[in-house]
Amino acid sequence: MRLAESEARARLVAHDHGILCTVHVERGVDAVPVAYVVDEDGYVGVPVDRVKPKASSRLQRERNLEEDPRATLLVEHWDRGDWSQLWWVRAELRSQGGAAPARAAALAAGLAGRYAQYRDQPFARVLVLRIVRVTGWAAGAS
């Protein structure tokens, strides 16, 4: 059953990781797992951290967003034993490449408060994306 937008947004805010999809100019959709945080103004912060090794200082998702600012964040809940608990939420996003430093700093603080690994804010950057639309579905009543 389709989730009300408020319920879909609440699940997005409460969830702690998802799949960020950006658009590669040649390959099409690039999907990567990410940690994220959502602020009360409807912005999503996705860290580019120094915790995990990276192949490059500039990630492909960043290059993709420079070419095409559209992105999608997909979160879901899967219960193999009880399919009545299945749900997913999709947030359509727009990159805010030139976002105000204060917004990026606030999202960085939110990430630090949410994830122990980010307590010391080991970020190279925080990608700032504005929520354009949120939709969702759940097997059971919302």
What are these regions (language model features)?
Residues M1-C21:
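Short, basic/aromatic recognition patches
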Residues V46-E76, R80-G81:
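Helix-adjacent hinge/juxtasegments
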Residues V13-H15, V29-A31, D39-D41, S57-Q60, ...:
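Short connector loops at helix/strand junctions that flank enzyme active sites
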Residues A8, S57-N64, R103-L107:
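Amphipathic alpha-helical interface surfaces
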Residues L12, N64-L65, L111, L129:
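A generic structural signal for nonpolar/aromatic side chains embedded in well-ordered alpha-helices
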